[in-house]
Amino acid sequence: MAFMDFSQRLQQISANSDALTQLGRGLEREALRITSEGNLSEQPHPVGLGSALTNKWVTTDYAESLLEFITPVSQDVDHLLTQLSDIHQFTYRQMGDERLWPMSMPCFVGKENDITLAQYGSSNTGRMKTLYREGLKHRYGSVMQVISGVHFNFSFPESFWQELFGDQSEQDRQDSISDAYFGLIRNYYRFGWLIPYLFGASPALCGSFLNKHNSSVDFKQLGCGTYYLPNATALRLSDLGYTSNAQSSLKIGFNSLDQYLDGLNQAIRTPSDDYADIGVKVEGEYRQLNSNVLQIENELYAPIRPKRVAKDGEKPSEALGRAGVEYIEVRSLDVNPFSPIGITEDQVRFLDLFLTWAVLTPSDDMDDSELACWRDNWNRVVLDGRNPDLMLKIGCNGERLSLQDWGVRVFKELQDVAVVMDKAAGNNKYQETCERLKGWVLNPDLTLSAQLLEKVKQNEGIGSVGHQLAAEHSQTLAERSYGFYSQPEFDVEAKISVEKQQKIEQGDTVSFEQFLDDYFADLK
């Protein structure tokens, strides 16, 4: 694979239509529950949704009010989006007059302590999940933790790897796949700024959010409580959003699975003086799981992650170490405020194209300084991406290229991928998506952030826009009928999830303290 260029690799996989029609995709969408007045819900997790610990479709993220909707893996884009829509419809039917906040950045958030941590019952596993969130609260504050996004899980089928690598032993295949996914990840850091440019939807913030952060950014003010940057795309991905200064010193590389796991394992074992000052157990009450830089692996902030489905009791890094990378998780998508389900078909198809292009495009190793240069491009795009004169770095050698020129170059090759994918599927959907979004590169006013900022300006603030969109989406979903699942299926899953939680609680045989000692035994 190493000696072939992009077009040769594309030609190679185009020989097998299954290689590009059997892509695996899964979606996770986060959304805050709000009252009909637009305030953060203080109600517990709706009973009709079952157990947040064990329901396979609906859970909670950081807060009791922060829902997370999870689809299974699908090879069909329409099925994927219909499943996500059905899960939303079911959820709305359990929420009374509450609604879902339609944006990534929270609004109308009062004090930190107004945000109730997600509750998962009395089992050791459930208590550990809540305690982890308690640690996040002490470390970063609750307001940052209720920023929401959409995560896109993505994998290539065996037929794809067969076309690229031919016959291999099981171990060689596993290593080749992991190496290819890490090549994709490096290219994602190089070129993935296209995602916040096109789909970033957090150009403005509520003052209630900004008040909790000391910012040196020169915001413009709108009305009495909205702050924005004229050309911003995704403030969620900036230092104001979900990032961690404490993690900036971590050196986690993406040149190989071994390098990545070494960095991750070091991070969960590295003590932090700042976090030690918080205390782990104070006056008999736990404040965090431990005082290391990362309490657990999931605390690592990253715009993309290599993943493998873990077995029971297995940590994410152990799963990767056992059998290599199985799929990747894209974490840079803002919630699309104009979609009732937070994402559209065009966005999914673009990600299909972009991630396929990223794995087929040669990807040299990347040291820490080069990674820092690429991260700087991301920061420029999230703060100033719609500036028509914006220049981005090409690596660390001082060369620069305009975002627009670079975007057009990438789209030229994405178009080649689209032709091959459409031929395999027997339609023109990928080419149509590609053509539409290329227009967004040429005209920043078409991007999601531009559309949203225009609406915010017209309505004199982000709060009223969010409230209006939440009401519209609620109505839209209420008028839809299920397209994939059924009400009985959802009801059964909710009932079974409660039974599963009870079984877990009844199955505990050790104290919570012993449970934590056992879980972190390998860190000692």
From Swiss-Prot:
What's the superkingdom here? Answer: Bacteria
EC number(s) on file: 6.3.2.2
Query: Which molecular function terms from Gene Ontology are attached?
Result: ATP binding; glutamate-cysteine ligase activity; metal ion binding
| Reaction equation(s) it catalyzes | L-cysteine + L-glutamate + ATP = gamma-L-glutamyl-L-cysteine + ADP + phosphate + H(+)
- Which Gene3D superfamilies does the protein's record reference? 3.30.590.20
Task: Name the keywords, alphabetized.
Answer: ATP-binding, Glutathione biosynthesis, Ligase, Nucleotide-binding
Provide the Gene Ontology terms for cellular component. cytosol
Q: Give the record's pathway.
A: Sulfur metabolism; glutathione biosynthesis; glutathione from L-cysteine and L-glutamate: step 1/2
A Pfam family that this protein carries is Glu_cys_ligase
* One GO BP annotation of this record: glutathione biosynthetic process
This protein's record includes keyword Iron-sulfur = no
- Matches recorded under NCBIfam families: glu_cys_ligase (TIGR01434)
Protein family membership: Belongs to the glutamate--cysteine ligase type 1 family. Type 1 subfamily.
Q: What is this protein called?
A: Glutamate--cysteine ligase
Organism in which the protein naturally occurs: Photobacterium profundum (strain SS9)
Lineage here is: Bacteria, Pseudomonadati, Pseudomonadota, Gammaproteobacteria, Vibrionales
Gene coding for it: gshA
